[in-house]
């Protein structure tokens, strides 16, 4: 009895609930031993088991997590992509948390047999004037920069937001894109018994132990640094090349990154997906410390490690490649026909665990009775405040200086965004990053987007807006949207209000993806983004990829020549009753509430096809989606980044200038093409409004009886973040 109580106490300490421990005992028909209890603590964690999200994720895609990443076919190639988070580790150890987040997502792409070609990130922080937040911000950017630059994968784009709700819970979401031969994609599924499990990469140490469990609970403020992994980008670079070579060997059957829960998760899931069991020999696993405990070996999340399944006789070829790249190699076990997960000290030694593999990998599925948050009702009922500042000059300058809208140059200038020479535009020059597919005329466009104000005020419509915003960003460079990857960042799933937000966000994602014919092919869920009793705003992050058929026809947001005519396309008349969630209200009025604007799916798709057609015809010289900060902010950014002035003919209210209604683009055309453009728009039933014409930089921006000196605006826009960091 004493032993049983001890095991149960260990289980509770490891995060297994009483009900879950009883369920394990019931399924096994016995009490697990201590070692097995450690295995369950990781595999049944939220991070590995998706306990609170599986019910909803099945509605998106039945094979949502079948492989390491999703892909689309473009130009005869498989373009592989996925986004993941490293939120908790980055809150505790910003530099290593962010760096190893890069390493992990790169290995997910690598495990598909794809060469990583680009990184993007979605970063959320609190107020950077807070010293603690500033430390996290600088550490995260440095970690991303050092790791990404060292492995030779460019960071080509992303977004960074600042909101006090993320002060103790920063969000570090990273997207990676890779390219592979469409006929040679690797699988993570074992394909039968009597195959060898081969370990490749760094040695196993104590870093990252309990990382999966750590990511499955609220941040407490305690020292959780032992749960944070430590990265080595130079080993990762060698691992990338070694993996791509190993996957060319005929006898290599499957590949899996050793991520969350390390050896345990990679081996058990590979075997389970293939309908077989496996047998592991711990003495064979390369170790940094000889005194490392068996359970530590299994749960360690030491970085830069991969698992391969190979035919017997193939291992020598794999070993030769590992020797070439100076990384560790070991045969650590084999697949077996019996569907059990067996762990031994060595091939002849003591059995430490013997578990039915389906019980180990299939955590329970929870479906809560959700509750509509009281804030949801209250926020919708809020009346917009009377405008305190009516001076357009002051409003625009305040918005351009706000860290959510100002240039992120301080961040991206630390990234090597041109390495491998695939990148067409430097960051911020276009609404999406564009990557050339070498030896073809095609390119891919990639973007990553979110809007926590929208998704807080209305998780369903807000998530739809984010998906459509991502699509607009691709349209703005001439790319047809193809597919989605997502990272769903939420608070405590045991809170019925958070669970409601999650469900509604999923429903919005599903509806928008169907409307745009952009399937969700991969993704991730990050729960427990809460500190004590405060959860973050619901923050679904959407990565989207699109195809550009002719790289010669791409456009960006920069105005080109003086005399070109500028138009607003789409919703030309703003609904002043639906400007809730706008940065104008948040920044100028300190107000978060009211109704957000909804997308019109049919019109939006028609509008997007219209823009793509005009880009293809060469009529549009620049395209810029109107989003954060509204119309005048978007117009000013195009002027700033192109070093061009603007003479406007617009007479508009503050709400029209700074509201954020959906489905709008700013475009420019040659003066000689303006009549043709207007005629095509009229015949296509597309709303357009002439805004003015492009002038020289010396002319500044003249609009709505206000004049802006371009040099002053450039200084405000480019220097805001750097001044805050350096203070």
From Swiss-Prot:
One of its GO terms (molecular function) is ATP binding. The keyword ATP-binding applies. InterPro entries: PRibForGlyAmidine_synth_PurL (IPR010074), PurL_linker (IPR041609), PurM-like_C_dom (IPR010918), PurM-like_C_sf (IPR036676), PurM-like_N (IPR016188), PurM-like_N_sf (IPR036921). Pathway: Purine metabolism; IMP biosynthesis via de novo pathway; 5-amino-1-(5-phospho-D-ribosyl)imidazole from N(2)-formyl-N(1)-(5-phospho-D-ribosyl)glycinamide: step 1/2. Gene3D superfamilies: PurM-like C-terminal domain, PurM-like, N-terminal domain. It is found in: Cytoplasm. One of its GO terms (biological process) is 'de novo' IMP biosynthetic process. Its EC number is 6.3.5.3. Mg(2+) 2 binds at residues 108, 257. GO terms for cellular component: cytoplasm. Substrate binds at residues 85-88, 107, 229, 301-303, 526. Keywords: ATP-binding, Cytoplasm, Ligase, Magnesium, Metal-binding, Nucleotide-binding, Purine biosynthesis. It catalyses: N(2)-formyl-N(1)-(5-phospho-beta-D-ribosyl)glycinamide + L-glutamine + ATP + H2O = 2-formamido-N(1)-(5-O-phospho-beta-D-ribosyl)acetamidine + L-glutamate + ADP + phosphate + H(+). The active site is at residues 47, 86. It comes from the Bacteria. Mg(2+) 1 binds at residues 84, 524. Belongs to the FGAMS family. Part of the phosphoribosylformylglycinamidine synthase complex involved in the purines biosynthetic pathway. Catalyzes the ATP-dependent conversion of formylglycinamide ribonucleotide (FGAR) and glutamine to yield formylglycinamidine ribonucleotide (FGAM) and glutamate. The FGAM synthase complex is composed of three subunits. PurQ produces an ammonia molecule by converting glutamine to glutamate. PurL transfers the ammonia molecule to FGAR to form FGAM in an ATP-dependent manner. Monomer. Part of the FGAM synthase complex composed of 1 PurL, 1 PurQ and 2 PurS subunits. This is Phosphoribosylformylglycinamidine synthase subunit PurL.
